[in-house]
Amino acid sequence: MVTQVPSSTNILVIGGGPAGAYAAGVLVREGFEVTLLEKDFFPRYHIGESMLPSWRQFLRFIDMEEKMKNYGFLPKPGGAIKLNQDKREGYTDFIANNPENSAWNVVRSEFDQLLLNHVAEQGVKVYEGTRVDEIHFSPEEPTRPVSLTWSKDDKTRGDISFNWLVDASGRNGLMSTKYLKNRTFNRSLKNVAVWGYWTGTNRYAPGTNRENAPWFEALTDETGWVWFIPLHDGTTNVGVVLVEEDSKRKKAEYRAKHEGKSLAEVQYDRYMEDIQLAPGLIGLLGDGKFDGKLQAAGDYSYHASGYAGPHFRIAGDAGAFIDPFFSSGIHLAFTGGLSAACTIAASIRGHCTEEEASEFHSSKIKTAFTRFLFVVLGIYKQLRAQQSQILYEADEESLDRAILSLRPVIQGAADADADLTKEELENTLDFCKSVLEDEPQANGNGAAKQDAVPAPIPVALSSGAGPEKDAKRREIEAESLRSLQEMDDCKRNFGTEVINGFFVKMEQGVLGLVRA
């Protein structure tokens, strides 16, 4: 890595995580000068270890797929999902039609460093341990960033000017939170996660083509869910996600019964009690040993009203975050990184106006966010009312039908082959809509907990009449259908999907936008 931050650059990227590194890598391969500032020194710890098969498509575009295949990360053949103890778990099979369609479970510190090193080798100037303190805007064009002030732990400071900015600063979201102030939290998905690492655990479906698949299971008290993700270093990440209100209530009740315990002791005891509410997980833990260290984070879902403006783009968690369910984070980071790179290249090369390019990027991020939001809301609606008929009918034994219906979303670019039809995409959207619109129906084993369901229907899909509401409904439906199409194949859909009258020219050396 280089050490002296220059005083100017053509394209500046804030953040060396997946969104920033990917955008930088795509842009430098187009022949542009790219500088990247990262506040941490890699490797650094990060949560988010389960991948989608769509990653292969993105990594292939920057010639990194073979590095991933040869590194030694644990192959991920699919994922198991259990939302009702009376029914068999559902399974999303990544490799049913193609053994090469598997994803990976990764140690993020290693994967993120592998990606950052790869783009540095491609020509990106990377500066680690470099914080961004302030972004400066043009006096003539107040919404256009033109330079920033950086600093390091050794007290050195400086300024760097640029023509283009990609904000991939993670959840801090500098542009969105500090300057645009356009971030909105989704009250339906205010959750908290607590996780730790275990050794000596069992594996899901050992000896079959499902071995090493992660396990996701709803808690029997309907307050949240757990994850079980095996890793190549011999550890397994076991996490608990609770609705924030339920987490607070459980902690308060526990403290009332166990006065004098420290916060760390309460957190540990609550974690151990919550995982007991996932019988399938207990079987997978077997005789495994917990390493004794817990970590926690607020999994608050949020989005922004826009993700671009004059000469800047926002990508990854800097703009939006949904939920850890379905491992959408890095897929959305890569989508945002590629869109940022495509639209910057298009603007530089005169394929369109800068306003048209920035609007394309914002629309791309919004549709990607909408896709996963619909599915995650449906999952939470079911796990909060487990005896209700939401994702499955009363006589169904598992989630398999629902998973098949949602295949274009939850597998990323995997099983959704290049022949995916408009009818199949519409069926997926219709399924999502029906889940969000229908009232939960008790199936005889219990009453629906409608008051506990935290997933309201998106306003544009709720029932009601009137020309304005009907028009908004059609707009969201069309946007969502486009977002489902983009799950097919990142190169194929980026090169064919029309957004705001443009589609992407997915060809290295001439990357940009083409008017439809």
UniProtKB/Swiss-Prot annotation:
Catalytic function, reaction form: melleolide F + FADH2 + chloride + O2 = 6'-chloromelleolide F + FAD + 2 H2O + H(+)
Pfam families in UniProt: Trp_halogenase (PF04820)
Keywords: FAD, Flavoprotein, Monooxygenase, Oxidoreductase
UniProt region (Disordered), positions on chain: 440-475
Keyword Oxidoreductase: yes
EC number(s) given by UniProt: 1.14.19.-
Annotated positions binding chloride: S328, G329
One Gene Ontology term from the biological process aspect of the record: secondary metabolite biosynthetic process
Applied use: Melleolide sesquiterpene aryl esters are cytotoxic secondary products with anti-cancer potential. Armillaridin shows therapeutic and radiosensitizing effects on human esophageal cancer cells. Armillaridin induces autophagy-associated cell death in human chronic myelogenous leukemia as well as of hepatocellular carcinoma cells. Armillaridin can also inhibit the differentiation and activation of human macrophages and thus might have potential to be developed as a biological response modifier for inflammatory diseases.
Molecular function terms from GO: flavin-dependent halogenase activity; monooxygenase activity
Uppermost EC category: oxidoreductase
Residues involved in FAD binding: G16, A19, E49, I330
Note: Armillaria species are both devastating forest pathogens and some of the largest and oldest terrestrial organisms on Earth. They forage for hosts and achieve immense colony sizes via rhizomorphs, root-like multicellular structures of clonal dispersal.
Sequence similarity: Belongs to the flavin-dependent halogenase family.
Purpose: Flavin-dependent halogenase involved in the biosynthesis of melleolides, a range of antifungal and phytotoxic polyketide derivatives composed of an orsellinic acid (OA) moiety esterified to various sesquiterpene alcohols. The halogenase catalyzes the transfer of a single chlorine atom to the melleolide backbone, resulting in a 6'-chloromelleolide product. The enzyme acts on free substrate and does not depend on carrier-protein-dependent acceptor molecules.
The protein's name: Flavin-dependent halogenase armH2
Annotated source species: Armillaria mellea (Honey mushroom)
Species lineage: Eukaryota, Fungi, Dikarya, Basidiomycota, Agaricomycotina
Gene name for this UniProt entry: armH2
